[in-house]
Amino acid sequence: MSVVSAITVTVPATTANLGPGFDCIGAALKLYNEFRFTRLEEGGLIIHVSGTEAERVQTDESNLLYQAFVKFYQHIEQTPPTVKIEIKLGVPLARGLGSSATAIVGGLVAANQLEGATLSQSQVMELAIAMEGHPDNVVPALLGGCRLAATSGTAWEICDVPWHKDVVPVVAIPNFELSTSEARGVLPTEVSRADAIFNTAHLGLLLRGLETGNGQWLKTALQDKLHQPYRKALIPSYDAVNIAAVSAGAYGMVISGAGPTLLALADQLHSEAVEAAMLAAWQEEGITAEVRSLSLDTQGAKSF
């Protein structure tokens, strides 16, 4: 491929961990950020932002999207071109839906496409994981679908996790934020053998439940002892929303990524009732939230 003058990249939101799959599993959702990069012959960096919470996005060289763009050129040992970047935000910031992953993947993919696809998808993925520090958001953001990532220490193995068509992700996005650093700060530095075994078994069951749509397996699988017991205290009325979701027919509810968005899994028959129940539970506590059922994105980052 030849060098091009402009490129647009769309990157999906992601939900990570899915309960027991802490830092190793995530799924792409049909909710997107769009980034357009245009080469400039002169002048300096220009960043325009529109959409969800646009005023909160940095428009200088500290912008994460731009930092990822520059990272690509550092990797190939070239000077990055001067660009105008137009950002259309659809993924809420700092809500546990992978907004930072969209920026990292978007910047790397855009740079790679501007330079004629110099790097393979696997190489782009390795750069994205290195920037993010963990694979569970950037991998599905890049590749789409539900993905499990494991490393031997030198390379990553990525596994596509089949997701049954009758398993519906329902996200409840509150009007408050929770930073990833704060959510990681409450985690213990060591866990017991019993808790490690618990999560290993439940992750295995989760994978089979997602593949088959077996509701009983999912009800059991969506439990965790490594991160959610510590993080849920940072999310007001977590228990009330959980009870409401399950009472309305959800298989279970988990924290999406680092939170504060909550993710319930339900079947097609109960998804609307689960939406309404989660919304009402937070409203009763005076918390405004957007609750919606989303489909799985199977394509990942796209450029045109």
From Swiss-Prot:
User: Could you say which residues bind ATP here?
Assistant: P92, L93, A94, R95, G96, L97, G98, S99, S100, A101, T102
> What's the EC number here?
2.7.1.39
What one GO molecular function would you report for this record? ATP binding
Instruction: Enumerate the Gene Ontology biological process terms.
Output: threonine biosynthetic process
Catalysed reaction, written as an equation: L-homoserine + ATP = O-phospho-L-homoserine + ADP + H(+)
What GO CC terms are in its UniProt record? cytoplasm
Q: Which PROSITE patterns match?
A: GHMP_KINASES_ATP (PS00627)
Q: Answer yes or no on keyword Mitochondrion.
A: no
Pathway this chain belongs to: Amino-acid biosynthesis; L-threonine biosynthesis; L-threonine from L-aspartate: step 4/5
Into which EC class is this enzyme placed?
A: transferase
Keyword list (alphabetical) reads: Amino-acid biosynthesis, ATP-binding, Cytoplasm, Kinase, Nucleotide-binding, Threonine biosynthesis, Transferase
- Report the locations given in the UniProt record: Cytoplasm
- Keyword ATP-binding listed? The answer is yes
Q: Which domain of life is it from?
A: Bacteria
* InterPro entries tied to this protein: GHMP_kinase_C_dom (IPR013750), GHMP_kinase_C_sf (IPR036554), GHMP_kinase_N_dom (IPR006204), GHMP_knse_ATP-bd_CS (IPR006203), Homoserine_kinase (IPR000870), Ribosomal_Su5_D2-typ_SF (IPR020568), Ribsml_uS5_D2-typ_fold_subgr (IPR014721)
Q: Which HAMAP family match?
A: Homoser_kinase
The protein's job, in short, is: Catalyzes the ATP-dependent phosphorylation of L-homoserine to L-homoserine phosphate.
The entry assigns this protein to a family as follows: Belongs to the GHMP kinase family. Homoserine kinase subfamily.
- NCBIfam families according to UniProt: PRK01212.1-4 (NF002288), thrB (TIGR00191)
Please report the name of this protein according to its UniProt entry: Homoserine kinase
Upper lineage ranks?
A: Bacteria, Bacillati, Cyanobacteriota, Cyanophyceae, Nostocales
